[in-house]
């Protein structure tokens, strides 16, 4: 089932697609990120932020797209800002890896494997610290770094099946 977009907006060159509540929360989170030195990574590697049933980034698209599930975007604006940064970093890792692949898709491990997830969580933690997210949120991200395989498989049909199980 595809969500019908009732609204669209462009913030700092990033297209936002979704309902009015989603767009407002996304604007709020992007505004928080805008003041940070790390925002350029977000702006350079995400072209679209789209309301969806579950969260994940499609870094391989011509316009890299962060699909965002309601549990993520309806959480606090600070948490959502951290999630945007996290998935933008996956897109950055994909882009960096693709530069070395002469036009073919890079190995999924380079941008979605456990080592890549640790890098994205570290970037998310950095952003959340810059936003004074609080000890509880920072501790949660640090806990995720201990076992960065929670997102499931990253290759083949199993990857898609694991994505469909996401609640976030």
Predicted regions and their residues:
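Auxiliary, metal-adjacent structural segments of Zn-dependent hydrolase domains
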Residues: 2-64, 73
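Alpha-helix boundary/N-cap detector
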Residues: 17-24, 115, 155, 159
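Sec-exported extracytoplasmic/periplasmic mature domains
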Residues: 34-38, 93-97, 125-133
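Surface-exposed patches in mature extracellular/periplasmic domains of secreted proteins
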Residues: 39-46, 101, 132-142
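Short pre-active-site segment immediately N-terminal to the catalytic Zn-binding motif
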Residues: 67-83
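Post-HEXXH active-site segment of zinc metalloproteases
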Residues: 77-79, 94-126
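Active-site recognition of the HExxH zinc-binding catalytic motif
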Residues: 82-95
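Long, well-structured alpha-helical subdomains associated
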Residues: 130-168
């Amino acid at each position: 089932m595809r969500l019908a977009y009732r609204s669209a907006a462009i913030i700092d060159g990033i297209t936002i697609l979704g309902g009015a509540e989603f767009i407002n929360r996304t604007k709020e989170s992007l505004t928080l990120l805008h003041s940070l030195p790390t925002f350029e990574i977000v702006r350079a590697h995400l072209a679209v932020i789209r309301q969806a049933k579950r969260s994940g980034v499609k870094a391989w698209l011509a316009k890299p797209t962060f699909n965002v599930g309601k549990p993520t975007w309806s959480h606090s604006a600070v948490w959502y800002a951290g999630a945007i940064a996290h998935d933008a970093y996956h897109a950055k890792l994909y882009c960096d890896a693709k530069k070395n692949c002469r036009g073919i898709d890079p190995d999924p491990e380079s941008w979605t494997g456990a080592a890549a997830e640790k890098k994205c969580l570290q970037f998310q933690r950095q952003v959340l610290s810059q936003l004074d997210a609080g000890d509880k949120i920072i501790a949660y991200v640090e806990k995720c770094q201990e076992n960065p395989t929670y997102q499931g498989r990253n290759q083949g049909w199993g990857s898609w099946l694991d994505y469909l199980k996401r609640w976030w």
